[in-house]
């Protein structure tokens, strides 16, 4: 099953992020990130085409999509710019989920972490082909299990 969770080793990655606020619509986050990209003055060739969200494990378990940050990946490390961050290299639990749908069920992930420490880093990545019908889109969720 291609939607079954699997553990993957992911290399260090860099990204530009902006905060998300409680009342934000998805469009508000996109506009804020586009403005930040413009203000940074980083060459557009430095950005990859994948966007994502930093989300909280507790909100995920409550079936609430309330991201803390919205981000875009960079293809390499850049120095001297604000709001550029690094995701650590390590082991990540990865799976696909339709986290914007009302009836999705986080139980398999809750079961996975039962009796374990609550994850500190959780990401939800957009797929490019989801840009038309985002309400029913699959997201790739990555949860840091262990840094390398």
Per-segment meaning from a language model:
Residues 1-148:
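A solvent-exposed interaction/effector surface
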